[in-house]
Amino acid sequence: MQKRVYRVINTWNYLEEKFPDWRLTIVDYGEDRANLEGHVKALGLKHVSFEGFKSPIDYYKRASILMLTSDFEGFPLVLAECMSFGVVPVVYNSYAAVGDIISDGKDGIVIPFCAEGYKADVAAKMVAEVMGNNEKRNAMAQAAIEKSKNYSVDEIYDKWIEIMKNIDEK
């Protein structure tokens, strides 16, 4: 429930008819598959598939957009991973790390946090701008690849070494 996958489905409800060539693939939905499938059926959505937990690499290779609508995360590695494949992240701004990872409108989309709760219609408008504009989506994908390099193993390793040296010097 923490991942709030139903929010992605509600957002897709606004998009499916406008983008008939696109599909929503839900990966790693937890133990809530029956409820989520029921929700998809109740909304009459046709272009949704549930893949369960599998290695994300194959999905990153064929995806254009990844949506993460959790209420909270620590540092979601899935964002750095997907960005390294040129997948544009769309993230609900409900936790502090979002701004550290994504520059809204440049290398991803940040759905604004709303005190009244998640607004699927607002999210859909933001996602539609990326879905409907190949040039924008490709530019964001390239920027995402560049940003992801900040989170590479080599980059992180070098930062840890620098931190350890600073601690040792003190």
Task: Provide a role label for each language-model segment.
Residues 88-92, 97, 102:
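Short hydrophobic beta-strand element within catalytic cores of glycosyltransferases
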Residues 1-14, 31-37:
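A conserved mid-protein helix/loop that constitutes part of the nucleotide-sugar donor-binding site
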Residues 153-170:
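C-terminal alpha-helical cap of glycosyltransferases
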Residues 129, 136-150, 162:
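A short, well-ordered alpha-helix in the C-terminal region of glycosyltransferases
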Residues 35-53:
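Nucleotide-activated donor-binding/catalytic signature segment of Leloir-type glycosyltransferases, i.e.
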